[in-house]
Amino acid sequence: MRYSIDLSLVRKKILNSIQNTDSGHLGPSFSCTEILFVILKKYINFKDKNRNKIILSKGHAAPAIYAIFDYLKLLKKNELNTLRKFSSRLQGHPDKKKLKLLDFGTGALGQGLSVSIGYAHSSKLLNKKNFIFCILGDGELQEGQVWESAMYIGSNNIKNIITFIDGNKFQNEFSIKETLKEVNLRGKWESFGFKYIETDGHSTEKLEKIIKNIMSYKYKKPVVVYCNTIKGKGVSFMEGNNKYHSVKKLPLEQYNEALKELDGQK
């Protein structure tokens, strides 16, 4: 897989930042690492005032976006070690007032797609030809505001919003299936006027190809990309284990084993 060394490094940055601060959402940060990595590395140019935007609606995965900022050398030296510290720019959930690299502060789930609509309308008024990437969690889809936004986007055929769903099959306490019965997500999104694409959320090649097609307006309608992902991806004992949704400092043996496994992915 492309970027395997880079992704291993990013996941180690996530792990170390959470280990250092003794608190953070590890599993959901690991599950969306590839999605955020591809978008931030390939499609966000922070030097361009008319750049594409990224809204991390599942804001608890902030350690992932901070780690990628650090990988891209956008943070101050050693700033990643200040995660969740008092007065740090790197709060537990994204805070745009503190970190100007962010496009919006999130944390209360369900709001990101609405914010994306605002950005899309702003771009239209200012004649900007940019895209807005919005990353939702699959548990977040239980928020009604998501569907209000989806109906609006579909009804108005807003094609410069690209919606990603991090489908790691878990939420805070339970699996998605334990919380709700099976829902036909494809049918729901398509009924609102979206092109629904399902893919491997850990394949950077597939993600890049899909984004390239969307940005060329191949589908002539809004697109939602459901990414099949694994919570805790990259560390065997964390994968699919909701125990690692939100963690304190790992026991030293677990921490060392996690680092060993991540090093082995180079």
Model-found features: residue ranges?
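N-terminal capping segment at the start of a domain
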Residues: 7-23, 166-168
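Cofactor-binding active-site loop characterized by glycine-rich and histidine/acidic residues
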Residues: 14-17, 29-155, 181
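Glycine-rich beta-alpha junction loops
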Residues: 34, 60-61, 168-169, 228-232
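Generic beta-sheet signal
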Residues: 52-54, 130-134, 161, 219-229
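Conserved thiamine diphosphate
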Residues: 128, 177-210
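A short alpha/beta connector and helix-capping loop motif
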Residues: 143-168, 222-226
